[in-house]
């Protein structure tokens, strides 16, 4: 895929020099006068420099040099245009090490080891903000217009109405489908847009008859069930209590998943490499996943022009159901140890909270799709992508993100997902009763919470 930068960040390199006095040594009675003059110059120089370079340095923890670290380096350059003394000390750490350091600091009651800014997985915010609130600086007064981000993404880092994260990468759910396989069945890509799951299944059967491959591939049933749940805006936690039993959307999602498997419409792989291979080798006609899966799809260069992106199907007969969900991603947080919150707020506001040019650069050079909604209006985001038949896929994905409902997992996302994985496995492999398995899942989560 050809990549074209349509906007360039112009970074002005500014340096400050200090006069150190290189003239000849003053003689006799002129020495005191010269010393006084030199002291005066130093005082004036200090007065002209309101803050040292060190005072304008922020420390950042994040992972992945080609993605998150790159994003911070580009944000630093962008901010330096108007703030030449500004610097970032970016420390690359794997996420597990970041979370361990955060929890260790919180349990010791000593936050002095924390950086000014850190990146956190979205699904970790509720858990950490609930259990270790002292880690964070609240962002409600940081100046960022949070309405310009996806509501579904914001919900992950908003706890009890308080914002703790600034959304970064986009995890909007997409349905990527093989346009050539769809056309072989006498259908069009447009037929798969804005469908219900029952409509999707009928279309899929036609594609399967024409191609002899499953319509979808997946890896781990709980993920797609959770995406279905979010697409209906149905929270698994309500008012701090587990809400799996009598959750109509959840039951419908599990029923839908079972039907997809039973009718051979979707193949479920436990091995991740086999899952990716099913896309790259053409043994499945599509996939529903967070938009980050696109890099894996695009690894099969021989399939360029044979893929398209549409939104996911919505649950039938569920009030509030939509065609949109989110899967994965991370957001920037400011720690309670931040030495200069005004500077951190201004930096984040001016870059990740407003800079469309920055988001253009990150898309082209790092493959980072914005969750900042105005980014979809740029020329870069509206440019057709040859791999997807000339479709302006990035604009579409940001627009998808703008429709994602927010739901509440509380501090127990991992517990809920684990319990649902067991429930779904029993329903599909043992034909277990769905209501019973949902009740067992709720009991399991409640037991874990009570411990």
Kindly label every feature range from the protein language model.
Residues 45-49, 119-174, 201-203, 209, ...:
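Hinge/lid segment of periplasmic solute-binding proteins
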Residues 1-59, 81, 436-439, 443-451:
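Short, low-complexity disordered leader/linker segments with a strong preference
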Residues 96-100, 233-306, 310-315, 342, ...:
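Extracytoplasmic ligand-binding clamshell segments of periplasmic binding protein
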Residues 54-65, 86-91, 116-117, 164, ...:
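Short, well-ordered beta-strand elements
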Residues 81, 140, 144, 157-223, ...:
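Helix-loop-helix "hinge/cap" segment bordering the ligand-binding cleft or interdomain interface
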Residues 126-128, 293-304, 316-419:
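C-terminal lobe and pocket-closing loops
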Residues 78-149, 184-186, 283-286, 300-301:
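Extracytoplasmic "Venus flytrap"/periplasmic binding protein-like
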Residues 137-149, 192-193, 234-252, 259-260, ...:
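Short, solvent-exposed loop/beta-turn-alpha elements that line the ligand-binding surface or hinge
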